[in-house]
């Protein structure tokens, strides 16, 4: 898991007709955010609206993981990271009202429910 905490929003349709493309995990500000698997930092910044400070990791076989709403980013584009490595400090940047990590797993461009994959971690 990228962080240990309480899942406050699950993958899938929301009551407001939008779709959560990941899960949201409530954690205290400053909690270490860990890479779910080894990979390369494809993006580390705050330009994507709503996500706040965001990290995208590219993994083997076209998999990508996303970690959003971070207080502080500890890696930069091109860095190689190991599974379990600290990549950020959790926060409440972007469009959220409480400290949390928004975590996505994608196969190529397609978002998939992270929970079945996290059971293996």
Q: Which stretches of residues belong to each language-model region?
A:
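Short, acidic/hydrophobic/Gly-rich beta-strand patch recurrent on exposed beta strands
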Residues: 22-26, 53-59, 102-104
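Terminal peptide-recognition signature
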Residues: 7, 39, 57, 84, ...
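Surface-exposed, glycine-biased beta-strand/turn segments
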Residues: 1-51
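Short histidine-centered loop motifs in beta-beta connectors
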Residues: 44, 60-84
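Conserved, short, structured surface segments that act as functional micro-motifs
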Residues: 79-121
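Solvent-exposed coil/turn segments that connect beta secondary-structure elements
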Residues: 12-14, 28-30, 38, 46-47, ...
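Short, well-structured beta-strand-loop connectors
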Residues: 32-41, 75-90
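Residue-level recognition of beta-strand microenvironments
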Residues: 10, 44-45, 70-73, 90-93
């Amino acid at each position: 898991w990228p962080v240990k905490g309480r899942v406050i929003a699950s993958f899938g349709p929301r009551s407001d007709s939008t779709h959560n493309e990941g899960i949201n995990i409530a954690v205290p500000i400053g909690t270490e955010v860990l890479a779910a698997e080894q990979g390369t930092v494809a993006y580390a910044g705050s330009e994507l609206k709503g996500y706040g400070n965001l990290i995208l990791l590219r993994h083997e076989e076209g998999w990508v993981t996303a970690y959003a709403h971070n207080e502080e980013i500890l890696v930069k584009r091109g860095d190689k990271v190991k599974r379990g490595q600290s990549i950020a400090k959790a926060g409440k940047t972007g469009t959220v009202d409480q400290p949390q990590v928004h975590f996505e797993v994608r196969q190529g461009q397609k978002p998939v429910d992270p929970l079945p994959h996290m059971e293996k971690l």
